[in-house]
């Protein structure tokens, strides 16, 4: 009961602050003259599927960084159901999304989820190595800028990558711990068949005993959820806000050919600069 109350306070506080930040951003955009971006809906949907969800541009740029970025993005999409479920379990311990029970579509989903978690952790390690050790030109620029930027801490990028890895790892620890301390729960044990990464995580946890696994699982649940909420609130303050806005930006993007000028509008409200004949 106490845990649910604390979780509710945390959830409302973090979500409330995020809503406040979002409102401030949207209130600024609301002052900009409107442009109709609800036209050509089929074309906008296609663009979103190809470039937003499909991440096509990242396969056309620098490699392997582009592919790695795409997998991190896809990992977040796949983890959306896991994050929602773990949030709900703060109030309803046995909650799962419709059709995502372990004996329904949840089993195959767990396999894909665990696979993406491991892939994303590997991608994060690769990206951290770029920031810390290799300093590629795309990140640091050419000399002398390269030498100057290489000396910067770049703490924001490293912090975000750490957040991402923490979300992935704590998800596996949470599920793996449950497999150890709930040996009589048929649904939890059935997850072993599908959630292969969590099952592997359960091995070292089991070696420490069920009490340790229980404590580790609970700690992982709190850390996972608090990092997600902290990440959510950090993004609007950072240059990585596009993590949230990327799909809307693609959907509402300008569809006219690059370089085409907007048609001039001449009416009584149009401001005229210079001499008008």
Residue ranges, per PLM feature:
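Membrane-embedded alpha-helical bundles of multi-pass integral membrane proteins
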Residues: 1-277
């Amino acid at each position: 009961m106490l845990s649910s109350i604390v979780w509710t306070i945390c959830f409302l506080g973090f979500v409330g602050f995020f809503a406040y930040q979002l409102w401030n951003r949207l209130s600024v955009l609301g002052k900009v003259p409107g442009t109709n971006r609800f036209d050509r809906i089929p074309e906008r949907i296609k663009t979103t599927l190809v470039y937003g969800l499909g991440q096509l541009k990242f396969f056309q740029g620098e490699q392997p960084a582009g592919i790695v970025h795409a997998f991190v993005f896809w990992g977040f999409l796949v983890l959306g159901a896991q994050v929602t479920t773990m949030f709900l379990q703060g109030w309803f311990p046995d909650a799962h999304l419709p059709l995502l029970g372990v004996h329904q579509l949840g089993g195959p989903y767990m396999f894909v989820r665990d696979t993406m978690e491991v892939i994303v952790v590997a991608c994060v390690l690769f990206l951290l190595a770029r920031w810390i050790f290799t300093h590629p030109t795309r990140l640091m620029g050419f000399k002398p800028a390269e030498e100057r930027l290489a000396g910067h801490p770049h703490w924001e990028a490293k912090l975000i990558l750490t957040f991402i890895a923490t979300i992935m790892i704590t998800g596996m620890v949470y599920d793996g711990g449950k497999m150890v301390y709930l040996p009589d729960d048929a649904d939890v044990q059935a997850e072993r068949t599908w959630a292969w990464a969590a099952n592997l995580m359960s091995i070292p946890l089991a070696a420490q005993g069920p009490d340790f696994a229980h404590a580790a699982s609970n700690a992982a649940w709190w850390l996972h959820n608090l990092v997600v909420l902290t990440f959510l609130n950090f993004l609007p303050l950072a240059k990585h806000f596009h993590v949230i806005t990327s799909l809307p930006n693609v959907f509402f993007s300008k569809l006219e050919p690059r370089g085409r000028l907007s048609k001039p509008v001449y009416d009584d409200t149009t401001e005229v600069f210079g001499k008008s004949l």
